[in-house]
């Protein structure tokens, strides 16, 4: 995931 695109961590 990325800096502001990580819903699960």
UniProtKB/Swiss-Prot annotation:
Domain of life: Eukaryota
Keywords linked to the UniProt accession: Amidation, Disulfide bond, Hormone, Secreted
GO CC field: extracellular region
Compartments in which it is found: Secreted
Residues recorded with modification Glycine amide: 9
Disulfide cysteine pairs (residue numbers): 1-6
Listed GO MF terms: neurohypophyseal hormone activity
Family in the record: Belongs to the vasopressin/oxytocin family.
Protein's name according to its UniProt entry: Glumitocin
Biological source species: Raja clavata
Lineage of producing organism: Eukaryota, Metazoa, Chordata, Craniata, Vertebrata
